[in-house]
């Protein structure tokens, strides 16, 4: 039997083919529904347009006046101010468009996934879903009603990933907004696997790095996922992720001696996962990876 099975397939279709009550751990990172919520993408285009025309540029005289107004003691921000008209440089217009896979995702679709998560997990199985911090209350309600309007996941807990090397967005304006990501954890019925004690559910790991062109825009740290898998499952258990992205959950499962089944709907990222596994002399098929 193959211990690692990955398909190029849509997530709902993939989950429906799994046996009910067969999964020990679902560890996943669905679209956060943030691309459509933000006006930042329009702002990014406007900034690029102004940069190209040179309309953002400032003069030496303007810098001197700006420096005096702000009380700056040195010229640390001078280059950015002269070129972009602001002290942060053009990075302040950080893009929040993660692609069609986020734009086309909906709360209704997420609800459909969560109901299937509950159905496929064994009693005592654990579900961990990373999601937008500002929408956690919505996620919590969906998890609590995964079976019926009054029945669903129990023991809902908060998991936090503190990034040790966050991008310095608006670093001189306010607290860093992108230094953490969060997940909610739920149990199907009772008696979950939990290989830890007195655990705060807070993890400190850096942003995952990788080869150019192979990183997913929302990729999670491999050691973080290995840690979560070891705490919430045992060796030989089945881990599932229907939003595989760059393949982190699959590699973390392989590294911790768990069985894994997952899928990725985006053809480009599925090919990236294939490329990563091919470095380990794995024989690959067009639409699946079996190890």
Q: What function would you assign to each model-found segment?
A:
Residues 122, 176-177, 182-192:
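Core SAM-dependent methyltransferase catalytic element
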Residues 1-167, 178, 195-291:
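S-adenosyl-L-methionine-dependent nucleic acid methyltransferase catalytic domains
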